[in-house]
Amino acid sequence: MANQQYYGTGRRKTSAARVFMTPGNGNITVNGRPLDEYFGRETGRMIVRQALEQVDAGDKFDIKATVSGGGSSGQAGAVRHGIARALANYDAELKAPLRRAGFITRDARMVERKKIGLHKARRATQFSKR
């Protein structure tokens, strides 16, 4: 039997992740480090595992992900997006429940740019009537 491998690209904010999924026992590696070591906060680890738990595939696959750009929250979202796409490549019937949960859709929200004359994207100097 050939070594089956499923691929998915995930993006979130300014992060991009390449996810390779092979049949295994649930080991998740991000940039060559174990998931628990790479994402220090529990929320990041939970976000990464969400797509697998949605389709009860938590211990069926080994996952290797390389992610770059952005911060920890964006990287976790990018890995989740990549895992969801890889699961859809593995079995087309999983696409519907993953889409209903919102894991297939690319979250298009980005940081709003700072405008000149303002402190931040929308924060202006304090206004005084008199």
Curated annotation (Swiss-Prot):
Q: Which Gene3D superfamilies match?
A: 3.30.230.10
Keyword terms: Ribonucleoprotein, Ribosomal protein
Question: Does the keyword field hold Ribosomal protein?
Answer: yes
GO biological process terms, semicolon-separated? translation
SUPFAM superfamilies recorded? Ribosomal protein S5 domain 2-like
Q: Name one GO cellular component term.
A: cytosolic small ribosomal subunit
Annotated InterPro entries:
Ribosomal_Su5_D2-typ_SF (IPR020568), Ribosomal_uS9 (IPR000754), Ribosomal_uS9_bac/plastid (IPR023035), Ribosomal_uS9_CS (IPR020574), Ribsml_uS5_D2-typ_fold_subgr (IPR014721)
Under the GO molecular function aspect, what terms does this record hold? RNA binding; structural constituent of ribosome
Domain of life according to the entry: Bacteria
HAMAP family assigned to the protein according to its UniProt record, in alphabetical order: Ribosomal_uS9_B
Q: Family per UniProt?
A: Belongs to the universal ribosomal protein uS9 family.
Q: Which PANTHER family does the record match to this protein?
A: RIBOSOMAL PROTEIN S9 (PTHR21569), SMALL RIBOSOMAL SUBUNIT PROTEIN US9M (PTHR21569:SF1)
Q: What is the protein named?
A: Small ribosomal subunit protein uS9
| Native species | Halorhodospira halophila (strain DSM 244 / SL1) (Ectothiorhodospira halophila (strain DSM 244 / SL1))
The protein's gene is named rpsI
